[in-house]
Amino acid sequence: MKSLLDKLNLVPLNSGVCTGPDGWLPGSTEPIISTNPTTGEVIAAVSPATPAQTDQVIRAAQTAFHTWRQMPAPRRGLVVRDLGNALRELTEPLGELVTLEMGKIRAEGIGEVQEMIDICDFAVGLSRQLYGLTMHSERPGHRMYEQWHPLGPLGVITAFNFPVAVWSWNAAIAAVCGDTVIWKPSELTPLTAVAVQHIANRVMADYGLSGIFNLAVGDGSVGRTLTEDPRLPLISFTGSVRTGRLVGETVARRLGRTILELGGNNAIIVAPDANLELATRAILFGAVGTAGQRCTSTRRLIVHEDVADHLADRLVNAYRQVPIGDPLAAGTLMGPLVTATAVAAMQRALTQAVAEGGEILTGGQARPDLGPHFVEPAIVRMPTQTPIVREETFAPILYLLTYADWEEAVRLHNGVPQGLSSAIFTDSLQTAEAFLSVAGSDCGIANVNIGTSGAEIGGAFGGEKETGGGRESGSDAWKGYMRRQTNTINWSRELPLAQGLKFGDET
């Protein structure tokens, strides 16, 4: 483990407060202890930001913004290009640290770093495409257009399940847009954030920059400081619905902006004509991958009654063959849950599901023989969409429901408070298009013959209802990090008014 930490410039006690290459601050005297969820062993410690240091970080980001916004966007893109290249050099050690600190399997940890690289590549191209529209003026000798300006220093508050990728979705795009970023990572995964800050600092030093990418590790008090501060025009928050509501309300009181990525109770509909082999593989990846701790994890399976028993048998057989164990070991497909609290939440959900008429088809047992936070992934057949099915439990529980007709399938699919990701498996063009239509899925992401997880960075990521409505990553999500300005230029020698208005001498 020491060799891995050395590659990432990590030591037994690390500062969690930084404003750039020469901006590491000592942090609080009460460190956050990072533990390995696989073994329960201590990895290292991080000193969190004090209130005064959080303010210092905000001031540094604010000062840097005034210079950074003046740099041409394509030049900012070159900086982000070099950040992506620096991440390429350290893909394996950083990915393994993600696995060590969070518990997802090694392939997923490395894949998460690849996601960071991909979004940097996307942002580089975007830096030359921050387009505004040109409009025809109704007045002669006038031109109208719109342009986009950066907002300012932003707060990015991320969750444990994607400890580095979600930061990059925000930071890479915000940076090419001309914003500076303050990162408050999850208390469960502070080391990955410190490692990324070291990598970013190396790139910033090459350009003589500071205050562009900033770090403030800490508990909820650091998050509250960021959300309450009017110097930060935008807060991007990824986490629970409960905390997301508080963030949204707090920022709204000061009329700031938010990007909220909250709960996801994602469903797959399996039509009677579906390719069940393809569906089984997608469901397994969506429900078991990352031990069911993705925002886009498959949590509900809505299957036509004609194929439900057959698909259930296939899934039970597949679940019983899932290799559970050390996420750094070759061949493992499911590692641990992140904390003992998560294990307890899974057990409570299963108990409630049975009380509500559910039948556990397979799994659900804790596996202390493997480590403190290991569980077996569970499939629970439910008689209907009961209260526990409508909740999001961040664990590998898959609820299986059946439907008789299309209207019932859509009603079940949309009948939850969340609206992040969705999918259907069908070989019918008509059924697929119905699912994608306005009368079909009500989610921000809707897929056909592919699961709910594994979104590409080229599309905007986010959802509706209690998912929060925010959009990150690709497409035109960049507009959320900028302010729109409409411009009118009069190049004539007259002063015609809009709508043909006559004012003053002209009667």
Predicted regions and their residues:
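N-terminal Rossmann-like NAD(P)+-binding subdomain of aldehyde/semialdehyde dehydrogenases
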Residues: M1-H142
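Conserved C-terminal structural/oligomerization subdomain of aldehyde/semialdehyde dehydrogenase
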Residues: T39-A44, L209, L232, I269, ...
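Residue-level signal for inorganic ion chemistry
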Residues: G40, R76, V98, C120, ...
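Rossmann-like NAD(P) dinucleotide-binding subdomain of oxidoreductase/dehydrogenase enzymes
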Residues: G132-L278, Y403
